Amino acid sequence: MALGWYELKLAKDGQFMFNLKAANSQVILTSELYRSRAAAENGIASVQKNGGDEKNFEFRENKNGEPYFILKAQNHQEIGRSEYYSSKAAAQNGVNSVMNNAATTVIKDITKS
């Protein structure tokens, strides 16, 4: 099975962030903002470590009732979150995709693009 990759990039304010992308290039998890590249790389390592275990995911709903999920580290700190989905089943499929792709070691650094 083809695995996805992490895409490390700069946010507009100069901070770092990353997306986990599935093999079809779809973003399946988005990180928070980090002040340094090293902190963002630590965030990627945390997704690699924690993203394969379903107990680290928490389902939520936005104010419009659209489901999404967050991935938490062992210290219960949020590592990343999903897009909004049309149904809980679709959100569960997103969790499954993160679980299947989290262990990838491919990191595409586009901070210089």
Swiss-Prot record:
UniProt keyword list: Repeat
Positions annotated as Sequence repeat: 11-59, 62-110
Record Pfam families: DUF1508
Keyword Amino-acid biosynthesis found: no
Similarity annotation: Belongs to the UPF0339 family. Duplicated subfamily.
Name of this protein: UPF0339 protein MS1092
High-level lineage: Bacteria, Pseudomonadati, Pseudomonadota, Gammaproteobacteria, Pasteurellales
